[in-house]
Amino acid sequence: STDYVFDGSKDGGYTEDDAPNPQSVYGKTKLAGEAALITSGARHLTFRTSWVFGAHGANFAKTMLRLAAERRSLKVVADQFGAPTSAALIADVTAQVLGQYIQSRRATSAEFPYGLYHLVAAGRTSWHEYARAVVQAAHLANKPLKLGPDDVQAITTAEYPLPAPRPANSCLDTTRLRETFGLCLPDWRQGLDHVMTQLLTS
């Protein structure tokens, strides 16, 4: 699921117990999916995540890398915050949790901690700082670009209107996930460094 089930008005990270209030059709459909799964009575694990990126498919990091090679300046929103989360981290955590499920052999037991969890990388940043980090990594790898990190300009959400509103705060608290399954989630920069290495050497 997604951070878009929240309206983004909270200070600090959202927990699984915070009341959802989606502001877009996308967020509403994700929340409806969560509710349908719960009401079905099926044992389940639902992971809410945010700002997903990877070496494959369309995502913010790849878009910034492409635009940095085409333009001499970029304007990126600086008043929306979250944790860029790599697809690899989501896959790894999912595999670890399912591995614990299999090893515990509690497939038919109510004791296994099924339910809703927040799964994002550690740390917090803005879209603007995220974009600067992408450009900086490309520069360090000697990728030919038309701009540098200082050419990535900060703007407000009001200066970049979109048809569907995005939460100003997409930070998700992962305490429940980490404590329940004994996980240590890496900082978002670690995942970005790995993906940038893939993109810049391919």
Locate predicted features.
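Catalytic helix-loop patch of NAD(P)-dependent Rossmann-fold dehydrogenases
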Residues: 4-47, 51-52
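Mid/C-terminal beta-alpha module of Rossmann-like enzyme folds, strongest
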Residues: 93-94, 100-161
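Amphipathic terminal alpha-helices
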Residues: 176-178, 187-202
